[in-house]
């Protein structure tokens, strides 16, 4: 009985400590936003917050770079806040804190329209403008979407595979997150593009959790599970680098075709080295820049087009080298 009592007390104290740490962290983040709002109100014209899928992701850092450059040009105080690792609950909490901090505008991914709709409604009721970036939240209260047409990007990826290969193809798909809207759209577009090609078969699909190590593990599993695998399609920024890490370790006589996403330095180097065959190009820098400009216009009461696609294309080794400005912006040379 005494042991059970002490276990119960220990569990209660642990719960209290964890709760205090969480609330302290939450309070610190909210304090930062509120302090930033005070600073913005005295030295800047507007205060915007960009909430990425995860802070340290290279792709989102390009979005942030574009947003920061536009913010500097338009006298905007910009904050870059969000989860260290992809977590939809932390993502939602950050948006809620931004609303509580009375910012002027929010830029964020629309990962799940049902979950985001109440928050976007709350923001709009408080006079805060909302722009989704990279991934839309259709049917929510967001005013503008700036980013890739994700279905189309998947479709042209499928067209690239058709154009670049001959004979029977067994494709393994590595996707960032199975439940993410934009990843689903990229997979669907790809499937639709190759559907009429009887020689092309989808062997399987695995999740990378938008990490290089996750992509490597997913690719290795697909290689082990499907002996006939001849091609890979990676739908998120770090998938390409992870896929080639797995194929390099896997003993196979087959020359595996690799189709990747986004012009991160490692991906472009792999394309140049012949380890990756084609890359779907997005424009993350432009997304960030255009999103800030859209918020500025909304703040001025101007009407905005609700869908602002930033374009997508496919590049191959012969399209290299990319110019430095093109690499930063993720655009085709």
Regions found by a protein language model. Give the residues of each.
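Hinge/cleft segment of the Venus flytrap/periplasmic-binding protein
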Residues: 10, 23-30, 34, 286, ...
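Hydrophobic alpha-helical segments within soluble ligand-binding/sensing domains
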Residues: 146-170, 214-216, 267, 283-300
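Short, solvent-exposed amphipathic alpha-helices that sit
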Residues: 59-74, 153-157, 181-200, 214, ...
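Extracytoplasmic "Venus flytrap"
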Residues: 46-65, 70, 74, 79-93, ...
């Amino acid at each position: 009985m005494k042991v059970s009592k002490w276990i119960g007390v220990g569990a209660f104290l642990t719960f209290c400590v964890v709760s205090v740490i969480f609330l302290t962290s939450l309070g610190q983040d909210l304090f930062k936003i509120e302090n930033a709002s005070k600073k913005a109100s005295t030295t800047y014209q507007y205060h915007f917050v960009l909430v990425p899928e995860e802070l340290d992701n290279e792709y989102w850092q390009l979005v942030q770079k574009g947003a920061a450059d536009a913010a500097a040009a338009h006298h905007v105080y910009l904050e870059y806040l969000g989860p260290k690792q992809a977590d939809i609950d932390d993502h939602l909490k950050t948006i809620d804190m931004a609303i509580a901090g009375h910012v002027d505008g929010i830029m964020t991914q629309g990962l799940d329209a049902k979950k985001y709709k109440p928050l976007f409604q709350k923001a709009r009721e408080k006079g805060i403008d909302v722009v989704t970036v990279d991934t839309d939240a259709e049917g929510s209260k967001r005013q503008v979407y700036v980013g890739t047409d994700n279905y189309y990007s998947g479709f042209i990826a499928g067209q690239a595979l058709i154009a670049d290969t001959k004979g029977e193809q067994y494709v393994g798909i590595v996707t960032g997150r199975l439940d993410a809207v934009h990843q689903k759209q990229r997979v669907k577009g790809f499937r639709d593009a190759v559907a009429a090609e009887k020689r092309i078969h989808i062997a399987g699909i695995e999740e990378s959790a938008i990490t290089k190590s996750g992509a490597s593990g997913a690719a290795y599993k697909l290689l082990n599970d499907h002996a006939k695998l001849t091609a890979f399609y990676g739908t998120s920024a770090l998938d390409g680098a992870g896929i080639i890490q797995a194929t390099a370790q896997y003993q196979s006589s087959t020359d595996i075709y690799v189709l990747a996403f986004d012009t991160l330095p490692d991906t472009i180097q792999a394309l140049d080295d012949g380890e990756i065959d084609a890359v779907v190009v997005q424009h993350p820098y432009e997304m960030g820049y255009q999103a800030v400009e859209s918020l500025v216009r909304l703040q001025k009461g101007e009407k905005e087009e609700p869908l602002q696609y930033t374009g997508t294309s496919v590049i191959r080794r012969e399209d290299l080298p990319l110019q430095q400005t093109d690499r930063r912006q993720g655009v085709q040379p």
